[in-house]
């Protein structure tokens, strides 16, 4: 039996003040180990339950359908991101909730990673109360 060691995983959280209210943005890199990455995603989203407007972005090491089922967040962008030299699948994601929408999604070929970068222009819907 061989044990695969995974590196520690974290999420960086920023709360941004915008003209349309506060937005919480999270960047993460989930495990490559099947099942473990789903658990990490569920725990991350549970920990962010109180955040009204939310964007979660990063390398999830999961396909889009699994990400949506596990997170219950809305995809803001789509595109094949891996492997960088000939991308055939999306494992990097931009997700949102709370009136956050995305337009102009783009996949970038950058020399910095074995993944391609995914970007989107964000818009915040102003709630009737504010």
Label every PLM stretch briefly.
Residues 1-130:
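Active-site regions of metal-assisted phosphoester/phosphodiester hydrolases
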